[in-house]
């Protein structure tokens, strides 16, 4: 019998005292998609207080295929709040209601693949004003938390090989407004949010596939395949049905890629204790992102993350969400299947 359990308390919605690890990260992420307008976006703040900065990302998928994108590493002096670079997250009621706001510049990309060369993309595409204000409401239970020993002691982790020590997710609804360069949209959609904390290097995982899916208010999915090494791969996720979660015990994803090795279409299968599921995905709009780090011995590491607004079909019903594919890049090529 395992002496490890998953714990999640309302106070975990607020920020924690950082570990001593230099790469301590505490992050929140939200996505929301308006099914009728076929638009939406995602917002992320990752505090790295021991390094003195936050990672701020705003990504908006517009109905005409353009993408508004901004990334920054604003300085921070505390981990007590998520408020950096024009982005702010507030917990109004733990597990139930949160608020997402962004006010600042955004890069307006006619061709999102320009981000294959970020330096060139930021020089050649216009920066315009963006304001977003969205209230997020949970429509599901919480999933996840922190793995601890039953006596309350945390598990020992090597910070150099860590992606997080705690993680949870929740399917959500989102209502609010997005204003870009004077064009305003009222958003009434569905999505998913997550939170993680603990030491993180983006290079700690060889590759992963993460699908967030909202078919409607009653049906949703999250598929996760995390390949940490040849001998370590985790496949799982959740099915939202009738207001409760079923845990995915196993899953697989078969992907068709385009000429740039970006996900184009795919089929995902999942097994729970009670049922089996098949969901098809077609990417509508995608932006390629990357993270680079130089190790202490001078090795240059490159991680590619492709973020696709995706149309999903389950039993003939159409929904929307994200497909996020992370790969380490070796000899110029992503290493995942």
Predicted regions and their residues:
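Structured soluble/peripheral alpha/beta segments that form catalytic or ligand/cofactor-binding pockets
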Residues: 1-337
């Amino acid at each position: 019998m395992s002496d490890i359990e998953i714990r999640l308390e309302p106070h975990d919605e607020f920020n924690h005292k950082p570990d001593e690890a230099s790469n301590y990260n505490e992050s929140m992420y939200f996505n929301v998609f308006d099914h009728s307008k076929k638009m939406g976006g995602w917002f992320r703040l990752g505090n790295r207080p021991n390094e003195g900065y936050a990672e701020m990302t705003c990504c908006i998928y517009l109905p005409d295929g353009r993408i508004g994108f901004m990334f920054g590493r604003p300085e921070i002096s505390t981990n007590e709040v998520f408020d950096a670079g024009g982005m702010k997250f507030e917990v109004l009621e733990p597990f139930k209601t949160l608020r997402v706001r962004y006010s600042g510049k955004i890069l307006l990309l006619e061709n999102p693949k320009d981000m294959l060369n970020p330096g060139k993309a930021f020089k050649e595409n216009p920066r315009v004003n963006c304001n977003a204000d969205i209230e997020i409401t949970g429509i599901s239970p919480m999933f996840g938390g922190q793995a601890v020993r039953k006596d309350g002691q945390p598990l020992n982790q090597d910070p150099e090989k860590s992606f997080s020590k705690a993680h949870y997710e929740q399917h959500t609804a989102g209502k609010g407004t997005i204003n870009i360069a004077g064009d305003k949209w009222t958003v009434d959609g569905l999505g998913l949010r997550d939170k993680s904390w603990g030491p993180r290097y983006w290079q700690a995982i060889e590759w992963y596939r993460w699908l967030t899916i909202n078919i409607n208010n009653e049906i949703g999915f999250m598929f996760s395949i995390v390949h940490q090494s040849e001998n370590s791969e985790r496949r799982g996720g959740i099915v939202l049905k009738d207001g409760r979660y079923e845990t995915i015990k196993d899953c697989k994803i078969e992907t068709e890629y385009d000429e740039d090795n970006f996900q184009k279409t795919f089929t995902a299968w999942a097994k729970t204790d009670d049922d089996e599921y098949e969901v098809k995905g077609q990417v509508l709009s995608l932006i390629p992102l990357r993270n680079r780090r130089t190790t202490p011995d001078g090795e240059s590491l490159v991680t590619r993350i492709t973020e696709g607004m995706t149309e999903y079909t389950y039993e003939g019903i159409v929904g929307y969400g994200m497909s996020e594919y992370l790969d380490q890049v070796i000899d110029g090529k992503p290493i995942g299947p």
